[in-house]
Amino acid sequence: MTTTQIKNRGFTLVELLIVIVIIAILTVVSLVAYNGLQNQAKTSTAKSTADSVAKKAELYNTEKGHYPEGLTIFTSNTDDSTTPPSDNKKNSWYMSGESVKSATLTDGSVPADGPLAIEYVKCPGSSTSPTGAQIYYYDFSSNKKVARVVGTGC
């Protein structure tokens, strides 16, 4: 009679190393994909913020007949006379200072305020009556600022 000995064998060192390398590759791929999704989400938020500012600028133009001089008019809730309205009657163009931040954007330099950072540049016109504006937001995927134009003259 022959008996076969059954030996309990574990994994070899090579097999364990192969599994570790596969796990490392999957981790790197998932991190890169996650960062890409994060940048897309930030860009989407920045574009939405710029669209909100553009709509508020259009409202301001409808009510006042010209575009605002700068972004601070939206967040200070004042009109051209710098008199704030009563608490129960806010200007239609008002935006919370927490929802938008004024910034000077440059390509390749991520803004400190993230996707809430907006650069508002009035178009040429008379000094008291701008005919439009360029509203810039930061594209986190391409690391560039992107312009959205409202009105004319830019």
Question: Which sequence ranges carry the predicted segments?
Answer:
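N-terminal leader/signal peptides at the extreme start of proteins
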Residues: M1-F11
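N-terminal signal-anchor/signal peptide hydrophobic helix marking the start
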Residues: F11-V21
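C-terminal juxtamembrane segment of a hydrophobic transmembrane alpha-helix
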Residues: I23-A41
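Membrane-proximal amphipathic alpha-helices
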Residues: Q38-A50
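Alpha-helix exit/C-cap motif
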Residues: K55-I73
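Acidic, glycine-rich loop-and-strand cores that form catalytic or ligand-binding grooves
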Residues: G70-D113
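Short amphipathic beta-strand and strand-loop transition segments with alternating hydrophobic
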Residues: V110-S127
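Short, surface-exposed interaction loops/tails
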Residues: K122-C154
